[in-house]
């Protein structure tokens, strides 16, 4: 199957360069969006400010439902909102002909997953203390602690794999699907395909953000039974 045209290939035909080119492009787009939305802040939001505020309020609402606290939801809002913008932009840019989704590379998804993993564990240790935090890994029954502890460790480590490979696999699959559609019917068929891929881009962004909140909640929200 013939490879699709990429604008980055006009500069240098290299997989590594293509990835870095689109990753930098995503970073620039996110910075521009943030700058435009905060350039002239108004009491009654309009235009891009209104759109960004709606996005942030939606994330806070989601975080409040997951963490059970408006304070905690807002505390971790910058992290989740930034990840959301990066993931969404990375997903959507791959739908545009001539561009490739950085999230279709395991390099980006693994870095994001590792960042979330390290941060929620850091927050859990900072909030509860290292002994109390890892004591939760042993479960409520001390007799089963030697069995539960390694299981919990593996379970937490598997989150890196699930977060990174879920996003990578779905977006990579979307790219291959789009390539096939464009090869078979380049003028008519892509229209519904673009709508489907846009929905999938939004869905994968939502899943990544809500799982980030879920992992943070598990780390910092102390259960009474412990």
UniProtKB/Swiss-Prot annotation:
GO terms for molecular function: proton-transporting ATP synthase activity, rotational mechanism. The keyword Nucleotide-binding does not apply. GO terms for biological process: proton motive force-driven plasma membrane ATP synthesis. Keywords: ATP synthesis, Cell inner membrane, Cell membrane, CF(0), Hydrogen ion transport, Ion transport, Membrane, Transmembrane, Transmembrane helix, Transport. Coiled coil: none annotated. Pfam families: ATP-synt_A (PF00119). It comes from the Bacteria. InterPro entries: ATP_syn_F0_a_bact/chloroplast, ATP_synth_F0_asu, ATP_synth_F0_asu_AS, F0_ATP_A_sf. Its main location: membrane. NCBIfam families: ATP_synt_6_or_A, PRK05815.2-3. Key component of the proton channel; it plays a direct role in the translocation of protons across the membrane. This is ATP synthase subunit a. The gene is atpB.
